[in-house]
Amino acid sequence: MLDQPIAQIKGLRVEFQTKDGPVVGVQDVSFDVNPGETVCIVGESGSGKSVSSLSLMRLVEFGGGEITSGQLVFDRREGGQVDLGDTDQALMKQIRGNEIGMIFQEPMTALNPVFTVGRQLTEGLRIHKNMNKAQAEARAIELLREVRIPEPERRMKQYPHELSGGMRQRVVIAMAMACEPRLLIADEPTTALDVTIQAEILALMDRLKRETGTAVMFITHDMAVVAQMADRVVVMFRGNKVEEGTVHEIFENPQHDYTKALLAAVPKLGEMSGKNYPEPMKLMGAEDQKIEPIKGSDEVILNVENLVTRFPVKGGLLRRTVANVHAVEDVSFKVFKGQTLSLVGESGCGKSSAGRSILRLVEPQSGKVEFEGRDILGLNQNELHKARQDMQMIFQDPFASLNPQMQLMDQVAEPMRNYGLASGSELQDRVANLFDRVHLPRSFMRRYPHEMSGGQRQRIAIARALALNPKLIVADEAVSALDVSVQAQVLNLMMELQAELGLSFLFISHDMAVVERVSHQVGVMYLGRIVEIGPRARVFENPQHAYTQALMKAVPIADPNQRKSEKDLNFKPIPSPIHDLNYSPEPSQYMEVAPGHFVLTTDSGY
Amino acid sequence: MTDAAKKDPLQHSSVQQEAEKAPRSQWRDVWDQFKSHRGALSGGILFLIICVGVIFGPLVYWNDAQYVPTGRDFIKLRDMRPIYHALWDPSAKMDWAYPLGTDNLGRDTLSRLMFGGRVSLAVGMAAMVLALLLGSLVGVVAGYFKRLDGLLMRLTDLFLALPLLPMILVAAVLFRESLSKSIGPEGGVFVLIVCLIGITSWMPTARIVRGDVLAIKEREFVLAARSIGTKPDKIISRHILPNVLSPIMVSATLGIATAIITESALSFLGFGFPPDFPTWGRLLNDAVDRMTLFPERVLWPGILISLTVLSVNYLGDGLRDALDPRIRGR
Amino acid sequence: MLTFTIRRLILAVPTLLFISLVIFLLLELAPGDPMAQVPLTVPPEVKEKMRLALGLGEPVHIRFWKWLVQFFWIEPQVLIDNIFGTTFSAGDLRVISWQTRSPVMDIVVQRLPQTLWVVGTAYIVAIVIALPIGIYSAYRQYSWFDQMGTFVSMVGFSVPPFFSGVLVIVIFSVQLGWFPSIYDTTLVVDSWDTFVKQLQQMVMPVMVLALQITAQLSRFMRASMLDNLNQDYVRTARAKGLSEYVVVMVHVLRNSMIPVVTVIALGIPSIFGGAIITEQVFKVNGIGQLLIGAIQANDLPMVQTLTFIFAVLIVLFNLIADVLYGILDPRIRYD
Amino acid sequence: ERGSDGQVNIIYWQAPSILNPFLSGGTKDVEAASLVIEPLARYNSSGEMVPWLAEEIPTTSNGGVSEDLTSITWKLKKGIKWSDGSELTSADVKFTYEYCTHPEGGCAQVTKFEGVTSVETPDDYTVVVTFGAATPFPYGPFVGGESPILQKAQFEQCMGAKAPECTDANFGPIGTGPFVVEEFKPNDVITFVANDQYRDASKPAFSRVLFKGGGDATAAGRAVLETGEFDYAWNLQLAPDVISQMEAAGKGKAVAGFGPLVERLMLNNTNPSPDLGPDERSVVRPHPFLSDPAVYKAMSMAIDRELLVEIGYGKAGKVTCSWVPAPEAYAISPEGCNVQDVAGANAMLDEAGIVDTDGDGIREKDGVPLKVLYQTSTNAVRQDFQALIKQWWSEIGIDAELRNINASVFFGGDPGSPDTFQKFYADVEMYANTFNGTDPQSYFGNGLCDKAPTPASQWQGENISRFCDEEFDALHAELSGTADMAKRVEIGQKLNTIIFEKGGMIPLVHRGRLSAHANTLGGVDLNVWDSELWNIADWHRAE
Ligand SMILES: Nc1ncnc2c1ncn2[C@@H]1O[C@H](COP(=O)(O)OP(=O)(O)OP(=O)(O)O)[C@@H](O)[C@H]1O
Ligand SMILES: Nc1ncnc2c1ncn2[C@@H]1O[C@H](COP(=O)(O)OP(=O)(O)OP(=O)(O)O)[C@@H](O)[C@H]1O
Ligand SMILES: [Mg+2]
Ligand SMILES: [Mg+2]
C-alpha cells in the first residue's frame, strides 16, 4: 500500500475546442506521485503544467478542455483506486477539496472577494467533514494557526482584500489543507509573492507536508524554488514531459537540452561574487555570445537628494487630507553614466514611487532630482515634456503596460510621433531598426500585444523606451513577470544595450539574484528609505544592515544542496507607511562602512 | 518535437513560424473575425438588406408613398389586403400591384414602409451617433479629469431629470422656424428630433463610459503613455477611447432601438414629422386602432423595427469582437 | 461610508436647487397655456381673467420663489401636520394644481399607490424573471437557450408599449375576455375576491412593462455573470468540492449581483415616475398619466412638482446605488 | 325605483379634473358636474329649453321676460332639497351669480352673465335677472350645464381669490341633482351615489355611478362596444370603420347627435410670411393669393366632402358648407357643396389667369407659387383629412405643406408660441368650433373685423381668419338689434353665405357628437346642446 503511488498519470492528452479547431494542451504526459513525496513540475509558461494539474481535478472541463485520452489513477482514502478520467462529477465533488487539495497561483484573485475568510475556509469542511458551523469554525481557526497567521479569530471575519498577499496565500493553503487531503496540488503558489513571503510559504508547505505526510504536486517555473522543495522533478516543454528524475539528478546531471537551457538561464545568488562588474549570462543556444563585463563610467548622470514623496489620504466631509502615505522618505542616490543602480526591497517599500518620482510621473513632495545637471523638479510642463526625452521607463507588467488595442509598430512609434522626431518612411525605418535592436522580427510590427509572449512584449516595451534615445531608463520590475528563460534573454538584452549605447539604468526589482547579475550599485529600500546602498559586490558580500541580511537569507538558491528551513527566517510585518499630518520623520543619516558603501544609522522601522 | 525547437529550445518556435507569414492588414483581420461570427454576419446582412431596401426600394418600386388615389379610384384602392392574404381568404380585396396592400386612404403600404424606413433608420442612426458622441465625451472627460467629474455627473443627473416633452416644445419654439427656413421643413424637423433624442439619451452611455475610463486610467499603459510624452488629448484618443469601445458599442445598439421608438412616440404626440411623412413608428401607431381588422399594418412596421434592432444588436456584437484584437486573435 | 453619504447629500442640495431652476425655466419657455383645454366657446378675455386668477400675472422670479417656499417650507409642514396632527401649515398656500385647484401633493399621494402597485410589481416580476434568465444564459453561453434569450429580449426591447399594450388588450380582454381592459383605481382590496380582481387587472399592464424591463435586466445579468464565471475564485470554489449549484448560485451570483443591484437601484426612480404610455393604454391613471396630463394641460405647478420629485429620486437613488455598491462590495471603501 | 339597477359605468377619455364648472369650463368637468349640480333650465336633445329647477321657462308671453327685454324673472320649483337636506332658495341662485362675477375669481362661465346688472331675490323662490340693455335672448344666466346653481352655504367662503383653496367644495359640490359625489380622484375617477334627497322619489334607477376618465377614444370605445366593461363612452372621435368594427362585437351601439360643430378650413386673410416682422406677420391684409376668389373657391371645389365624411366621421358627420349649420334654419347649402369638381376648379383657376408658368406643376399668381402651409392639431382623422386634401389640391396645382401640432399647444393661447391657432402662422388651418346654446349671434361675431387677433391684443380674438368685410359687420349689427326670430334667421343665413363666398373659411363637415352606450343601458338620449348626461336620472338597465 505504501509504495503504491497516490496518483498515476498515464498518457494524458487534453484538447481544447477553439474557434480554429482543437488545440492540444498536453499530449501524452505520464508520471506518478508517491505518498509523502513532493513532485515538482517545471516548464515555461504554456507548457501544460496547469492543464495537467487541472485535469487531475477534472477542472479542465470548466475551461473548455477535454481529456481525450489517458488515465488519471487516484488512490482514494477508502475504496481503492479510481480513474479520475472517467468518474462522474458527483463523485469528483467528493474527491475535490477532500482528497485532493489545490492551491492556485494568484492569491489576489483566488479568493472570492465578497465572502469572509472564515466563510470560505469553513465551506469545504462543512461539506466534506459534515461539521456544523461551530466545529468548522474551530477547525478553521486551528488551520489558520497552523499556517501561522497572526490573530486567526480576527482574520476569520475579514475579507480577502483586507489581508496582505502573503496572508491570502496562506489562507488558500489552509483552505487546500483543510480536509487533510492525500494529495496537494500547488500551482505556482509563490510566483506572485515577495521573496520574503515566498520563503515563508515554501517553508510552511514543507513543514505541513512533513507533518501530515501529504503528497505534493508542486508546479513552478522557478528553478530556485524547485531546488528548495522538490524530491522529484518533472520537466515539461510544450505539452510534453521531456525529463523526469530526482531533484539531484536534474540539477546535477540534466539530460534534455531544454532542462539544460532552463538551468543555464537561472541567475543564482552568489554567482557573481568576486566580479566587480555585471556581465551578460551565458545562455544555451546563443553561440556567438560575447561575455564581457560592463564597466560604465564615473560620471554622475542622475543625482537624487533627499527625495520625499507622499500620497495624501483624504477624508472627512470636505475631503481634506487627513494623513499621508510616506511612500518615499528622504532618499538620496546617484546613478552613473553607463551603469545600473538597483533598488531592491519588499513590495510596498516605495521602489516604484521613487522611480516614478524621478520622472515626475508622480509629483514628489520635496528634494532634488538632478538629471545631467538640470533640476527636474523645477521644470514646467513644457520643459518636463522635453526632459522626458532623455529619461524613459519600462514597467513591470508587460501585459498591462502595452495598449491592447494598438499595433506594436504604433506603440513603438508613438514616442517619436509625440516628439515629432520622425514621420513617414523614416519613422518606419526607425521602428524597424528598434525591432532589430531588441531582436524581434520586423514582421511582428503589425501584431497586437496579445499575440506576443511575455518576453516579446517586454522587448517591445524596451524598444519603446529606446525610441527616444534616452540616457537613463528606469526599469521598474522589468523582468519580474517573465519566465526564467525569457527573463534571462531580456536581461542580456538590457546589458547588451547598456554596453553598446552607454545607457544608465535605474533597475527596480525584488529579485536579489537578478539584481546581483545586473547591477553596479545596489540600494536596499525599506519603508520608504534606503537602508543600505553601495557597490553591488560589497552590499551582497558584506551586508551590514539587519534588513539586508534578512533579505539575503530569504532568497532561495537554485541548488538543492542549499535549502533553507523555516527557522532561518525572521521577518516582521512591514509597519504602515501612513502617518498623520503632523508627523515629521527624522532625516536619514548614513554611515560609510567602506568607500561608497553606506548604511542607515537612524531608525528605519525595521 | 521539431528540429528547430531542438536546436534552439528557448525560442518560441511557433511564434517564429508565424513570423515568416506575410504581415496581415488590420482591416483584413477585422473582416476575417467578423465573418467568422455567425450571428454578426447574418445580422450584418439583414441590416444591409434593410438599408438597401429602404434606400433603393423607393427608386425602383412603382408606387409613390405619398400618393392618395382620388375620385373613383379611392374607394377601389383603399384598404387593400396584402397578396399573401389570398392564401386563406381568396375573396379578399387585393392586387398584385400592391404587394402589401394599402391603408385606409389607399396609400401603398410597401412604399410607405420603405419610405418610412429611410426616416426611421436615419433618425435612429443619427440620434444614436449623437447620443454616443455626447455620452462618450462626457464620460471620458468625467472619468479622465477628476476635477470635472463631480460637475459632469451632476449634469448627468440634471439631464436624467429633465422631462422630454417640455424640452421638445421649447426646442420647437426656439429653433423650428429658423431650421426649416435653412434646410426645409422635413430637414428642420429631422435635425430637431435627432438633436432632442440625442440630448436626452446620452446619460447611460456617459455613466458606463466614465466607469470604464476610471478603471482604464489606472492601467499601466496609460502611465507608460504619459512617460513617453503623450499629451492628454492623445492619451484619450489613442489609449482610452479604443479601450472603452465595447460598452459604447453596446449602448449604440440599444440606442438605435430607443431612438426609433422615441421618434414614433413623438409623432404619436404630434411633435414629429409632417403627417404625410411616414416613419415606422408612425405607421405602427396609426395602425394600432385597426389592429384586428388589418393586422398586417401593425405587423410589418413592428417586425421591421424589431428586425432592425435585432440585426443591429448582432452586428454590434460581432463588430465589438472584431474590433477587439484580443478576441480577434483567438 | 457615512461621511461619503453625508457629503453627497449635502452636495445634492445645490444640485437639486439648480435642477429645479432649470426645470422651471424650461417649463416657462415651453409654449402652451393652461387654458388650452378650455373650450373655444369661452372667450379670450375670460381666459385671460382665469389666467390671472392662477397667478400667471406675476413675474417669473416671484413665481419661482413662491414655488420654492411652498415646496420646501410649506409642504413639509403639511406632512408633519398630517402625521402628528399639528397645525403648522394652517392658512399657508400650498402648491396648487392649475387643473384641479387642489394641492398637488394630495393628488400625488392619491396616485402613488396605483403606480407603485403596477409599475412596482412589474419591476419585481421583471427582476424575478430576468435574473434566472440572465444567469442561465451566461452559464450556458451560446446555447440555444442563450440565443433565444437574446432574441426575445431584443424583441421585447424593440416593441413599443403602445403596440404591445393594445395587442394584449385585444387578445386577452376583447377576444378571450379574461382580464379587464380598464384598470379600476377605486378597487379596495379587502377580501379574496377583490384580491383576485386586483390581480386580474394588473396582469396585462404588468406583463407589458415587465417585458421591457426583463429584456434589459437579463442582458445585464448575463454580462455580469459572464464576467465572473471566468474568475479565478470560481476555480477555487470548484476545487473545494462545492457543487455546481453552490459555485454558481452562491459564489458567482453574489459577485455578479453587485453591478446588477446598482442598475436595479438606478431604475427605481422610474417606478415612481410611472410608465407614461403603459399607464395611458391601460388607464392605470398613476403618476405617469398625471404627468402627461399635466403637461398637456400646461399645469405648470403640477409638472414642476412632479419632475422635481422625480429629480430628487434620481439624485437620491444615484447616491443609494453608489452606497449599495460600497456595501455589497467589501473592497470598495468610500473615505 | 331608486337605486334598483345597481351601478352604471361611464368612461370619458378625458378625465375631469374638478367638479366646479365655474373654475374649469372644460366639457369633461361640466358634464361630470351635471350629475350633481343643475341649472334652472336646460336644453333637451332637440335644442328646446325645458324648465329644470324652475317652474317654467319665462317668456314675454307668460310675462317672465319684461317687454323691453331687460329683465327675466325665474320662479323656482318648491321643495327642492340640496343633497345635505337643506332647501334650495333664490339666495343660492343669487349667490351663484356673485360667485361667478367676482373679479378675482377667474370664473370660466362669466360670459353667461354678460350684460347682467343685477340679480334680485324678491322672495325665496323668485329670481329677477336684470340686464343693462335689451337682451333679445335672455337665457344666458342659469341655463344649461355650464351655468348650474351652487349652494351658497357651501361656497360662501370660497369667493374670489379663495376659490382654489376650497378643494373639498370644488371636488364635492353639494347639489340638487340625482347623484352625490362619493369620492373624487382628480383626473382619474369619480364615484357617485344616488342622492336620497332627489326630487323624484323613483329616480335615479342606478344607485352608483363610476365615472372613469383618461386614456384615449379607442380604448373608451373598446370598453363599451367590445368588452362591455363600461356602459357609456363619451365623444368617440374615431374613424367610422373602427367604430363599426367595434359595434360588430354586439355589446353596444354608437349614437350620434348634431350641434353646431363644424370642421372647417380657415383661410388666412393676412400674409403669414415668415419674412414679415412679428408685428406684421398674420396681421396685414391681404394674403398674396388666398384673397383671390378663384383660388379659395377652387380649393373648396376640389374637396370631396362626402368622402371626408365617410372616411372621418361616418354617421357622425354631414357634408356642409355652412359656418353655422345648426339650428337647421341658419344653414345654407350653396350649389355644388357636396360634389367634387376638380375640372371645374382647374378651369376657374385657368380663367383667372393663375397658371403654372414655370412647369413645376404648381400654379403661380403674380409670380407667387400657390404653396400653402396647412396646419392642424394632432389627431388621426385630421391627419387623414390633411393627406386627402393635399392630394386633391395637388391636382389643381396647389402644393400643400402639412404640419400637425400638439393640441395643447395649438389650442393653448400662449402668446410666446408660434404654433397657436390664433397666431395662424400658416395659410390654411383646420379645426372645429361650435357655440353653446341655440343662439348664434355672438358666434357670428367671430367674423367681425375688430376681433382679429393681433400682437396688440396678445393674439387674443376669435376672428381667426382675419376676415374683414363691411357688409358683414353691418349685418351683424342689425342682428344684435333684432328680436324677431324669422328675421334673425334670415340675417344669419346671409352671414353664413358671406363668410363662405368671400373667403373666410371653407366649411368641411358638420360634425355630430358620437357616443356609445351598452345595449343594456336604457334611457340614453344624446344631447348635444347641453350635458350629455343631462337625463342620467332617467337612465336604467334594459334587457
Ligand atoms: N481554456 C483554454 N482554452 C484553450 N487553450 C487552453 C486553455 N487553457 C490552456 N490552454 C492551452 O493549453 C496549453 C497549456 O496551458 P497551461 O495553462 O497548462 O500552461 P502552464 O504551463 O500552466 O503555463 P503558466 O506557467 O503560464 O501557467 C497552452 O498552450 C494554452 O494555450
Ligand atoms: N497613487 C497612490 N496613492 C496612494 N498611495 C500610493 C499610491 N501609489 C503608491 N502608494 C503607496 O505608497 C507605498 C509605496 O508604493 P510603491 O508602489 O512605490 O511600492 P513598491 O516598492 O514599488 O511595491 P511593489 O513591489 O509592490 O511594486 C505603498 O504603501 C503604496 O500603497
Ligand atoms: Mg499555469
Ligand atoms: Mg512597484
Regions found by a protein language model. Give the residues of each.
Chain B
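Gly/Trp-centered helix-boundary motif
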Residues: 1-136, 147, 236, 259-260, ...
